[in-house]
């Protein structure tokens, strides 16, 4: 083994297998691109993103860790979200929750 070497299992690895997911249609109503990272609490994203916020409370993008989705000005797209796991306590981001979900 080499330090830092990854030894992945053979075949495909499904991200977030068995976790609760939801799809939401999002429109960027602003005049600047908005990028949302993989672990950002989607409910607390930039106010220029228009979507059903209450439906996204406790969810993040269902994408690989360390990646992001970019919403161009005027763009509308549907994204898949996955429920936050663990203790489901949210601090930071835009300060809209600051505690248990």
Swiss-Prot record:
It comes from Cupriavidus pinatubonensis (strain JMP 134 / LMG 1197) (Cupriavidus necator (strain JMP 134)). One of its GO terms (molecular function) is urease activity. PANTHER family: UREASE. Its main location: cytoplasm. Heterotrimer of UreA (gamma), UreB (beta) and UreC (alpha) subunits. Three heterotrimers associate to form the active enzyme. Keywords: Cytoplasm, Hydrolase. Pfam families: Urease_beta. The keyword Cytoplasm applies. This is Urease subunit beta. It catalyses: urea + 2 H2O + H(+) = hydrogencarbonate + 2 NH4(+). Gene3D superfamilies: Urease, beta subunit. It comes from the Bacteria. InterPro entries: Urease_beta-like, Urease_betasu_sf, Urease_subunit. Disulfide bonds: none annotated. GO terms for cellular component: urease complex. SUPFAM superfamilies: Urease, beta-subunit. Its EC number is 3.5.1.5.
């Amino acid at each position: 083994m080499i330090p830092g070497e990854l030894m992945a299992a053979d075949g495909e690895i499904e991200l977030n297998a068995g976790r609760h997911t939801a799809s939401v249609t999002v429109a960027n109503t602003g005049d600047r691109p908005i990028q949302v990272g993989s672990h950002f609490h989607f409910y607390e994203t930039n106010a220029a993103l228009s979507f059903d916020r209450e439906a996204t409370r406790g969810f993040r993008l269902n994408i690989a860790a360390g990646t992001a989705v970019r919403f161009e000005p005027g763009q509308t797209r549907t994204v898949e979200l996955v429920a936050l796991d663990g203790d489901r306590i949210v601090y930071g981001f835009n300060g809209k929750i600051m505690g248990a979900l």
